């Protein structure tokens, strides 16, 4: 059983929902990311998504685009991210999912990336621009090295796409609650509950919901119908508002509030 599957099994046994937190690796620098991952886990995150910064983040809104720019300006690269994850693994076992775009992985080499990521302690990979129809080669590499490949479903996904994802899904499925790019929203789409229910009928792995969840109340609302919630832009926004000295405290406070809202 993968670390992600084990986490969801334990959560289900305890009637709890998963809190998945997103930060961009290398923002403001990799030393900060290395310190934040254990802090996120201690504050209540069950899974940590690490954004791999990319120069053309087409699925991301302004907050995460700026975060990627800061990380790239700090010299963040994929090999450096994997080295950082390897160091984190000496003191923290929270599941880590790399989230990003296909191009950096392709440049690194698919087989080499899967081997290097697994050796570093990465548990899963979500590539937002790699649909299941085009993922066979990468998924074969990931499967050989024990990496869960996470796929996206959206409000516009038809039954055919849902079936394709159901056949390939490992770890969990990420349901994008809104059309458009990442970023905080003022409310939760009314269709989330019914759409998630339909997906859960077709898919055996857990379904988590992300994009636009920015407050504890929204997280609680989504958690009522999903297996977990993903909060990203609202956390990354804190990086713009607070100094490096303040950041850890502010992130911990916010994540703890999210955890309390969806149930301890």
Curated annotation (Swiss-Prot):
Show the PROSITE patterns listed in the entry: TRP_SYNTHASE_ALPHA
The answer to whether the entry has keyword Transit peptide is: no
- A Gene Ontology molecular-function term? tryptophan synthase activity
- Which Gene Ontology BP terms does the record give? L-tryptophan biosynthetic process
Reaction equation(s) it catalyzes = (1S,2R)-1-C-(indol-3-yl)glycerol 3-phosphate + L-serine = D-glyceraldehyde 3-phosphate + L-tryptophan + H2O
Its UniProt pathway annotation is: Amino-acid biosynthesis; L-tryptophan biosynthesis; L-tryptophan from chorismate: step 5/5
Q: Gene3D superfamilies from the xrefs?
A: Aldolase class I (3.20.20.70)
- Tell me a GO cellular component: cytosol
- Residues in the active site? 49 (proton acceptor), 60 (proton acceptor)
Q: What class of enzyme is it?
A: lyase
Q: Which UniProt keywords apply?
A: Amino-acid biosynthesis, Aromatic amino acid biosynthesis, Lyase, Tryptophan biosynthesis
Q: What does this protein do?
A: The alpha subunit is responsible for the aldol cleavage of indoleglycerol phosphate to indole and glyceraldehyde 3-phosphate.
- Self-association state and partner proteins as the record states: Tetramer of two alpha and two beta chains.
Protein family according to the UniProt entry: Belongs to the TrpA family.
Q: Could you identify this protein by its name?
A: Tryptophan synthase alpha chain
The organism is Geobacter sulfurreducens (strain ATCC 51573 / DSM 12127 / PCA)
Q: Lineage, please?
A: Bacteria, Pseudomonadati, Thermodesulfobacteriota, Desulfuromonadia, Geobacterales
